[in-house]
Every structure is written in C-alpha cells, then in structure tokens.
C-alpha cells in the first residue's frame, strides 16, 4: 500500500466510521475514489485530513466525513439519477456517480466548472453531465436531489 492509499484507508477508519457511516458500498466508494485528484495542487497534503479545503471563489471542499455522511444518508441505488447543485471540485460528484446511474451537476462558476471537468476526466468518471448553469433553474427526470449546504 502506497502513502496515498494508506491515507485513504486511515481517512475511512479514523474519520468516516466514527461518524457511523458503515454501509459497505459507501465505504468501498470512499476507499477507491482518489480524493487527491479533486484537491487543488497547493493543498494536496491535506487531501485526506479532516478539514475544509479552499477551492477559490469563496468555495471549499468539505471535510471527508461530511461527504461520507451525505452519501450514507441519501442511500443511492444504482438506477438513480441525481441532480447536484454546486459541483465545486467534483469530488462529491464522483462519489455520487459511483453509487448511481447518472449525475447531472450544475456549477455557476466557470473556473470551478472547468476544473471539475478536468478532475472527473482524470478520475475516469464518465456518467456525469456537468453543466455551467445556475442551479436555481432546476432539472427534470431526477431521482434524488442533493444540495450541499456546507
């Protein structure tokens, strides 16, 4: 196990499980989606720490335990279509995509949108429709609505 894999393992064991996120499918997703691919270069060393990470434009990545709890609570099924409002770095988008059929993610900021697209491509995630769009307009044909408020 390399250092990043060990950090990911430690994140799950020391941050996620204590928050009573115990669903094996969610834990598997958190274990195999490389969070470091979604963290700005200046903050790579913090990818698996229990802290918010600045993305610029007043936005942050929430601590991993928050994403984990959201994933646990929405209890996605493989057939679900998800609308996410506020793509940010696309880490949560990647988690959602791993647990659902398709994700539509709306981001209003052009720079965050472009970075999110690159991040998802690097991670090999292709069941996401990223849109540069104001989320207040909404979208149809969605099984679950997740609006990160953190």
Regions found by a protein language model. Give the residues of each.
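Short, surface-exposed glycine/acidic/tryptophan-bearing loops
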Residues: 42-55
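Conserved nucleotide-cofactor-binding alpha/beta core module
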Residues: 75-150
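Alpha-helix N-capping/helix-start residues
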Residues: 23-24, 64, 110
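A short alpha-helix capping/helix-coil boundary motif
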Residues: 5-7, 50, 71, 94-98
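Short gly/ser-rich anion-binding loops that grip negatively charged ligand groups
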Residues: 56-64, 86
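Conserved alpha-helix/loop element of class I SAM-dependent methyltransferases that forms part
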Residues: 13, 47-50, 61-80
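N-terminal auxiliary segments of SAM/dcSAM-dependent transferases
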Residues: 1-42
């Amino acid at each position: 196990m390399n250092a990043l894999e060990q950090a990911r393992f430690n994140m799950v064991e020391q941050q996620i499980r204590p928050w009573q996120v115990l669903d094996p499918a969610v834990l598997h997703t958190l274990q195999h989606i490389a969070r470091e691919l979604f963290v700005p270069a200046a903050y790579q060393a913090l990818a698996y720490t229990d802290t918010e990470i600045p993305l610029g434009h007043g936005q942050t990545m929430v601590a991993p335990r928050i994403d984990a709890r959201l994933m646990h609570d929405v209890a996605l099924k493989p057939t679900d279509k998800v609308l996410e409002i506020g793509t940010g770095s696309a880490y949560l988008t990647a988690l959602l995509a791993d647990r659902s059929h398709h994700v539509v993610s709306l981001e209003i900021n052009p720079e965050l949108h472009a970075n999110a697209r690159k991040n998802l491509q690097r991670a090999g995630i292709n069941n996401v429709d990223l849109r540069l769009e104001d989320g207040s307009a909404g979208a149809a044909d969605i099984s679950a609505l997740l609006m990160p408020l953190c």
